[in-house]
């Protein structure tokens, strides 16, 4: 009786009593499943985990008396491993919100599990537009970027600058195939041609045979529909083979980590599309300074998005007083995102988080004035133009 009386007093004082009863397992639990050891680990990995921890620390008390916990795991770039871990976490660990890191195949698999278990799934590092198109779910948010935005940024810009004839070097799984298809659509719509493509396995060790096929095509542009370590190794190999004397490289998904690894001598003048840059404005620089102090490197778009997604999820839980997935998703879809990652970001009914993207040009060594000063913003691509429109969408939730 004393406990009930105390609870009644707290309710009268304005505490979120009903809400407290709606925190599952008395813990708000966030999980991150990403590549921690493979070709994509540098662009997300431990840096992504650190970014989520920063968000949890910055959020402070979300619901009085309820802890916020965080766990992370390596999916090894295997969809079955990702799905199994996600299912285990939902069933046994009580994870309320799952962040999907790099690799489209793993995120598509995790999105299915999250939808089945009715838990919030934030896809950060995966590029395939299927996550908010053909395979959209009521619980998926596709947060940072997608292959449509990359194609409409980099692909469109290069064709309009005279790069009409293309050949693709494509990572042979969901992300690479989506990126090639979406960029092909943009090329053809702008009067260009695709002369062919060659597929390589994820984590390929030798690109020589693939590049010889590309060279034989006599295309102007070699579109790199890959990312991370694969993009780095294919660019290095292209220079070693002298391919760049006859073809222009188009990195369709290049991260600042990749530029840092390759150096400006190899990457100067390259166009790329990014959704975020550490040196964009005062807000991005302030957050990146804190991140740099922990990781000793500047953050990628994905690591910044990991922070933003976790923070905005926790803001939703705090506002509602519950981690109920349906209520949280409804709140997120009606609330604009304004933080160091996105300005006036909107989560549509299909789960796509719409925000501006940026066409970047990599600086010449002589133009770079301080460490990690790598990009010049060529153009802003408004979110409404970057992503699929309602007329183009195949998502049953957005009709």
Question: Predicted regions span which residues?
Answer:
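Extracytosolic ligand-binding ectodomains
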Residues: 3-9, 21-399
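Repetitive helical segments and hydrophobic/amphipathic motifs
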Residues: 11-13
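Sec/Tat signal peptide C-region and signal peptidase I cleavage site
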Residues: 15-21
């Amino acid at each position: 009786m004393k406990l009930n009386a105390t609870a009644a007093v707290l309710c009268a004082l304005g505490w979120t009593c009903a809400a407290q009863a709606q925190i599952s397992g008395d813990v708000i639990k966030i999980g991150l499943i990403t590549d921690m050891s493979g070709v994509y680990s540098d662009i997300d990995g431990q840096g992504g985990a650190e970014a989520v921890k920063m968000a949890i620390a910055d959020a402070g008390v979300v619901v009085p008396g309820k802890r916020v916990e965080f766990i992370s795991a390596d999916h090894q770039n295997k969809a079955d491993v990702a799905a199994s871990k996600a299912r285990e976490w939902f069933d046994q660990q009580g994870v309320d919100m799952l962040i999907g890191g790099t690799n489209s195949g793993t995120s598509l698999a995790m999105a299915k599990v999250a939808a089945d278990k009715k838990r919030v799934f934030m896809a950060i590092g995966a590029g395939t537009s299927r996550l908010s198109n053909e395979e959209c779910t009521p619980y998926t948010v596709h947060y940072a970027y997608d292959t449509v935005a990359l194609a409409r940024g980099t692909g469109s810009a290069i064709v309009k600058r005279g790069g009409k004839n293309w050949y693709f070097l494509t990572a042979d799984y969901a992300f690479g195939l989506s990126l090639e298809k979406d960029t092909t659509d943009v090329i053809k719509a702008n009067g260009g041609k695709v002369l062919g493509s060659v597929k390589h396995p994820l984590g390929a060790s030798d690109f020589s045979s693939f590049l010889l096929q590309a060279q034989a095509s006599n295309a102007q542009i070699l579109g790199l529909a890959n990312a991370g370590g694969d993009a780095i190794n294919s660019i290095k190999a292209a220079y070693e083979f002298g391919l760049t004397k006859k073809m222009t490289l188009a990195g369709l998904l290049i991260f600042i980590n990749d530029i840092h690894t390759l150096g400006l001598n190899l990457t100067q003048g390259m166009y790329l599309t990014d959704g975020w840059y550490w040196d964009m404005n005062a807000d991005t620089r302030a957050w990146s300074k804190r991140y740099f102090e922990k990781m000793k490197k500047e953050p990628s778009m994905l690591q910044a998005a990991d922070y933003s997604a976790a923070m905005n999820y926790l803001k939703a839980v705090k506002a509602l007083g519950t981690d109920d997935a349906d209520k949280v998703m409804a709140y997120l879809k009606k609330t604009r995102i304004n933080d160091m990652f996105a300005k006036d970001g909107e989560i549509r009914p299909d789960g796509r988080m719409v925000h501006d993207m940026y066409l970047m040009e990599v600086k010449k060594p002589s133009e770079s004035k301080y460490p990690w000063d790598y990009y010049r913003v060529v153009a802003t691509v408004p979110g409404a133009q970057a992503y699929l429109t309602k007329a183009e969408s195949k998502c049953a939730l957005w009709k």
